[in-house]
């Protein structure tokens, strides 16, 4: 789908970022800018800044921000197209999809909207059947016995599908919906012999399943009798794919941002009861192992994931598998281990809400430590297992982002393996060296943008690269005068290299530079962060004679000895502050520099 650029520009020009952000954040004027508490993470000291002049916002804590479109995408967790439409409605501008959208794709979009409409219409019918009919009394009593109050049932829009094969079928038919489309939406089943349609869900308690925008896209029907299966979910449809659905994400999103943590539970019933008990940042996958799409959703919201699965064997195995997948993706992973045989509902019913919340807060441990404890018996009694788990643990420690947490883990894990902490640290350093020299650690190949904020000492070359890009963003004439004298490959900083490439594209379509407009050309959040940092980098308004030429010459010469000396200094500084990400990055650069000198 494509929206005409002139429409995008008109919407952006008519949307004042100060007015927009003020709907979500209480702002106070500080000098030329406005500042408030960040809406994307929990903080006590305001670090979220809005520039009315530049029409951008930026959080100096979590680094999120951008122009009006990027702010809307982040605050509402929607796509760029959806953000444009949303802001278009705000300023009374009609947003039409471009001509490249075919009639076929238009029909698909229309059908998907009708599928969602069907799900949301039948929801009210199901709810009425549960709360107001004799046939729904047994199901309602079952819910009451399980601790579901009428208020909770209403809040979660829970319903009942009667034991009638045409309850949903007849309702949708009377409303004028295509029965074939209702089948494709997963609300009906079909007899393949005579092609007759009947209700998929019968005699089940109905739990609506919503997408990230809060629209109902499927159902989970739970039996309250001996009927099998215990849970019957909607099939895979154009609007419902399990790999893309996290139950309760639409409701939990604001709490996840506030707490800077997401708690992943085993099932949606666990989520409902935990949320009702006061644990708000909870979600669950729909009976499937965590997909890459799920992990991507999580990474957009927070870097901290806590797993709280059932306290049985299957729950522990699922914790090991899921935790490893999350750790491998660079997330900070923690575990709350429920007592044997218990799920969250069991714990809440045995104790109370307050004790449950206290337990979750106090029993949290690093996934790496949980994993070692799970294999402690093998470690103590099997030499082969000891060596295998020792190597795995060292690798897992290399993935822990926080130096403080990693050092604490080393102390605890050393006791389990019955070695000195120095032994683990030695093996960990060797692992870093191997990963860097063999280029087997792709996660940290790009330069961490925060290195300029943490480590103040820049090399001569780094200063030149940053100053050059800053000058090239001042106006189009400056860019055109110098862009042919240097190529992206001359830059050592990967972010500045990419910004230089984007500037060429930007100036080919724009005569004047504004950071708000430039944001439209950049999809990477990290790159936007660097662009904002660069915007705050102060230079003289007018470069002195040959200043830009000097920067280009420095970049092309790239003094290796000066770079190596500075890199060693930065490696020591990164080690001192316990930042493993920076250690790995600078170690990689040192290895590469030494290779080039040989």
Curated annotation (Swiss-Prot):
Keywords, comma-separated and alphabetical: DNA replication, DNA-binding, DNA-directed RNA polymerase, Magnesium, Metal-binding, Nucleotidyltransferase, Primosome, Transcription, Transferase, Zinc, Zinc-finger
Enzyme Commission number(s): 2.7.7.101
Listed cofactors: Zn(2+); Mg(2+)
Binding-site positions, Mg(2+) 1: 266, 310
Superkingdom in the source lineage: Bacteria
Any one biological process term the GO annotation gives: DNA replication, synthesis of primer
Family annotation (PANTHER family): DNA PRIMASE
Identification of the protein by name: DNA primase
């Amino acid at each position: 789908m494509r929206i005409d650029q002139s429409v995008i520009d008109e919407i952006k020009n008519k949307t004042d970022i100060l007015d927009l952000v003020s709907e979500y954040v209480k702002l106070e004027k500080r000098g030329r800018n406005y500042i408030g508490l960040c809406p994307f993470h929990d903080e006590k000291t305001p670090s979220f800044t809005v520039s009315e002049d530049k029409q951008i916002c930026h959080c100096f804590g979590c680094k999120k921000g951008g122009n009006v479109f990027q702010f809307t995408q982040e605050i509402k967790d929607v796509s760029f197209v959806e953000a444009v439409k949303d802001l278009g409605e705000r300023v009374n501008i009609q947003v039409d999809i471009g001509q490249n959208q075919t009639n076929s794709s238009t029909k698909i979009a229309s059908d998907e909207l009708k599928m969602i409409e069907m799900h949301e219409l039948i929801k009210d019918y199901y709810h009425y059947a549960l709360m107001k009919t004799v046939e729904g009394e047994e199901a309602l009593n079952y819910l009451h016995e399980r601790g579901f109050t009428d208020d909770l049932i209403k809040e979660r829009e829970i319903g009942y599908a009667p034991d009638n094969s045409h309850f949903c079928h007849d309702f949708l038919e009377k409303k004028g919906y295509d029965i074939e489309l209702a089948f494709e939406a997963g609300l009906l089943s079909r007899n393949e012999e005579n092609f007759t349609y009947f209700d998929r869900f019968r005699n089940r308690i109905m739990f609506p399943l919503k997408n990230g925008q809060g629209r109902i896209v499927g159902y989970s029907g739970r039996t309250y009798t001996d009927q099998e299966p215990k849970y019957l979910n909607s099939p895979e449809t154009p609007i419902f794919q399990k790999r893309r659905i996290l139950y309760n994400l639409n409701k939990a999103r604001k709490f996840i941002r506030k707490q800077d943590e997401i708690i992943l539970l085993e099932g949606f019933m666990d989520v409902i009861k935990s949320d009702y008990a006061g644990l708000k940042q909870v979600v669950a996958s729909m009976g499937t192992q965590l997909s890459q799409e799920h992990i991507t959703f999580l990474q957009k919201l927070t870097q901290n994931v806590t797993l709280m699965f059932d306290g049985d064997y299957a729950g522990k195995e699922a914790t090991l598998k899921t935790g490893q997948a999350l750790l491998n993706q660079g997330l900070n992973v923690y575990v709350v281990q429920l007592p044997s045989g218990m799920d969250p509902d069991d714990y809440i019913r045995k104790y109370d809400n307050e004790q449950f919340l206290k337990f979750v807060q106090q029993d949290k441990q690093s996934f790496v430590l949980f994993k070692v404890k799970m294999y402690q018996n093998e470690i103590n009694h099997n030499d082969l297992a000891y060596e295998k788990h020792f190597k795995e643990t060292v690798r897992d420690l290399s993935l822990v982002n926080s130096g403080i947490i990693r050092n604490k883990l080393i102390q605890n894990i050393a006791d389990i393996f019955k070695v000195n902490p120095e032994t683990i640290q030695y093996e960990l350093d060797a692992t870093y060296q191997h990963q860097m020299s063999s280029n087997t650690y792709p996660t940290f190949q790009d330069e961490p943008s925060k290195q300029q904020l943490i480590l103040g000492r820049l090399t001569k070359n780094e200063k030149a690269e940053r100053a050059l890009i800053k000058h090239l963003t001042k106006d189009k004439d400056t860019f055109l005068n110098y862009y042919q004298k240097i190529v992206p490959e001359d830059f050592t900083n990967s972010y500045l290299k990419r910004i230089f490439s984007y500037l060429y594209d930007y100036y080919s379509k724009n005569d004047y530079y504004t950071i708000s407009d430039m944001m439209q050309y950049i999809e990477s959040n990290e790159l936007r962060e660097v662009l904002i940092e660069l915007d705050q980098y102060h230079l003289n308004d007018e470069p002195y004679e040959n200043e830009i030429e000097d920067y280009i010459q420095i970049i092309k010469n790239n003094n290796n000895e000066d770079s190596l000396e500075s890199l060693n200094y930065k490696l020591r500084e990164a080690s001192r502050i316990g930042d493993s990400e920076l250690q790995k990055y600078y170690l990689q650069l040192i290895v590469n520099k030494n290779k080039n000198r040989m």
